[in-house]
Regions:
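C-terminal accessory module of base-excision DNA glycosylases/AP lyases that mediates lesion recognition
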Residues: 1-38, 126-127, 141-211
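Alpha-helical ds-nucleic-acid-binding substructure associated with the helix-hairpin-helix region
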Residues: 8, 27-31, 59-60, 64-137, ...
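A positional/architectural concept
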Residues: 16, 22-53, 58-69, 73-76
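Alpha-helix C-capping/helix-to-loop hinge sites
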Residues: 38, 53, 57-58, 74, ...
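Structural motif
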Residues: 40-48, 95-99, 188-196
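A general alpha-helix detector
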Residues: 49-54, 86-90, 128-132, 164, ...
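Short alpha-helical scaffolding segments that buttress acidic/His motifs in well-ordered protein cores
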Residues: 50-55, 104-108, 147, 198-202
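Short helix-capping/linker segments at secondary-structure and domain boundaries
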Residues: 58-66, 112-116, 152-157, 205-211
Length: 211
C-alpha cells in the first residue's frame, strides 16, 4: 500500500484518476457524463485535523463547523500543548461532548509525551498509518481512512464502511440491496490505484444522482 506524502489530489489528479476508472467501469463512465467531476478535499494534517475528525463524529457538517469555530476562538493556536493548557470545561463550553473531550485530551497527551507522532505517519504505509491512528482513543478505522485521504492525500484509500459510499455504490450499480463493507471493497477493487478519487466521485454521485 502507499507510503509517504504524495502529490496533492487536485482537480487535475481527480480528472486523471477518474478517466482511468471510467475506462474500466461503464457505470462510472455513464455517471461521470451526467454529474461531472467532484471537487478536491484537502485538509490540514496533524493534531488539528485529528481533533476536527473527532469533533465531526456522529453530528452534522454544520454542527461540526460551528463547534470548530468555537474551538478556534479559544485556541488561536490549535496544538496539543495549547489544548492541554485550556481551563477545565473549556472544550465542553465550546460544544464537545464529555466523551469527545476525553478523546481530544487523550490525543493531545499522546502527542505531548511522544506516544504518537502525526509527522511519522507520512513515512508509513497506508496500513501502518491506519493502525497507528486506530491505537488512539476515539479514532477508528473510518477516521483513520479519512485522515489518510484528505490530510495525507493518499491516492488509493476506500473507506468501505462509509454508509454514503455504500448507498452510492448501490445506486450506481443498480443493486437491490446496499452492499456491506466487504462487498463494497470487492466492487471497487478494479479502481486501484485510484480508490481515493473513486471515493470522492461516489460521495459526489450520492449527493447529485437522480432519485
Amino acid at each position: 500500500m502507499g507510503r509517504g506524502r504524495r502529490a496533492l489530489i487536485d482537480r487535475r489528479t481527480i480528472r486523471k484518476g477518474l478517466k482511468v476508472i471510467a475506462a474500466n467501469d461503464r457505470d462510472v463512465a455513464q455517471a461521470l457524463k451526467r454529474i461531472g467531476y467532484p471537487e478536491p478535499r484537502i485538509r490540514p494534517d496533524g493534531f488539528e485535523a485529528l481533533l476536527s475528525i473527532i469533533v465531526s463524529q456522529q453530528i452534522s457538517t454544520g454542527a461540526a463547523q460551528s463547534i470548530m469555530g468555537r474551538v478556534r476562538a479559544i485556541l488561536p493556536e490549535i496544538s496539543a500543548p495549547a489544548t492541554l493548557a485550556l481551563p477545565d470545561g473549556a472544550l465542553r463550553k465550546a460544544g464537545l461532548s464529555g466523551r469527545k473531550v476525553e478523546y481530544v485530551t487523550s490525543l493531545a497527551q499522546a502527542i505531548v509525551v511522544g506516544q504518537f507522532d502525526p509527522v511519522a505517519l507520512e513515512q508509513q504505509t497506508d496500513s501502518q498509518a491506519i493502525a497507528s491512528i486506530c491505537m488512539l482513543r476515539g479514532l477508528g478505522h473510518w477516521s483513520a481512512e479519512v485522515y489518510l485521504m484528505f490530510s495525507l492525500q493518499r491516492p488509493d484509500v476506500f473507506p468501505a464502511g462509509d454508509l454514503a459510499l455504500q448507498r452510492a455504490l448501490q445506486k450506481l450499480k443498480g443493486w437491490d440491496n446496499r452492499p456491506n463493507a466487504d462487498e463494497s471493497h470487492a466492487a471497487v477493487a478494479h479502481w486501484m490505484p485510484w480508490r481515493t478519487v473513486g471515493s470522492l466521485f461516489l460521495w459526489h454521485f450520492y449527493r447529485g444522482a437522480p432519485a
